[in-house]
Amino acid sequence: MPLLNLVLDNGSRFVADVEKHSSIALWAPPEGGIEGNYQRRLRGIGYRTQIITAKGLGDISRFLLESHGVRPAHLGKKDKRVFTLPPELAIYMDTLPASAKGFVLWIIEGKVLSLFELESLVGLPAAVPKLKVIVEVGSDYNIRWMPLEQAVSKMAEGR
């Protein structure tokens, strides 16, 4: 019943947790819509946000931090080529205005990521200043979140 699912929090606890922990694991209702309130709240206090999907990323640390090759479909008519693209985070961080509080990388469909990939996302904000990472790792009836490091350790234990 998402229409009756009232959020008692106005987003301030979420923003405080994002600023404190820098990487957050999020569970949102599968119908969607509620997480947009939290994205709007982050943008309202000065963060820039970018939403990407976890499906098809490949090596996440290489995709975000290093130059990586992309092979377009050739359909048998052309030769096989590889285009080199710059790191995604470099593109976003270079265009970040000086007045911005930081940059939030919001990753949807994070349930397809392995524990190793989630662990690499935990350390990402320490490597890149002004970066916050939010990963939607599953769905739940109500929206809830916890530090990504804590969520990864619980997933590793099987809880």
Swiss-Prot record:
Reaction equation(s) it catalyzes: a plastoquinone + NADH + (n+1) H(+)(in) = a plastoquinol + NAD(+) + n H(+)(out); a plastoquinone + NADPH + (n+1) H(+)(in) = a plastoquinol + NADP(+) + n H(+)(out)
Keywords, comma-separated and alphabetical: Cell inner membrane, Cell membrane, Membrane, NAD, NADP, Plastoquinone, Quinone, Translocase, Transport
Keyword hit for Cell inner membrane: yes
Keyword Ribosomal protein: no
Any GO molecular function: quinone binding
Domain of life of the native organism: Bacteria
Subunit structure: NDH-1 can be composed of about 15 different subunits; different subcomplexes with different compositions have been identified which probably have different functions.
UniProt-listed PANTHER family: NAD(P)H-QUINONE OXIDOREDUCTASE SUBUNIT N, CHLOROPLASTIC
Task of the protein: NDH-1 shuttles electrons from an unknown electron donor, via FMN and iron-sulfur (Fe-S) centers, to quinones in the respiratory and/or the photosynthetic chain. The immediate electron acceptor for the enzyme in this species is believed to be plastoquinone. Couples the redox reaction to proton translocation, and thus conserves the redox energy in a proton gradient. Cyanobacterial NDH-1 also plays a role in inorganic carbon-concentration.
Similarity comment: Belongs to the complex I NdhN subunit family.
Protein name per UniProt: NAD(P)H-quinone oxidoreductase subunit N
Organism: Gloeobacter violaceus (strain ATCC 29082 / PCC 7421)
Taxonomic lineage: Bacteria, Bacillati, Cyanobacteriota, Cyanophyceae, Gloeobacterales
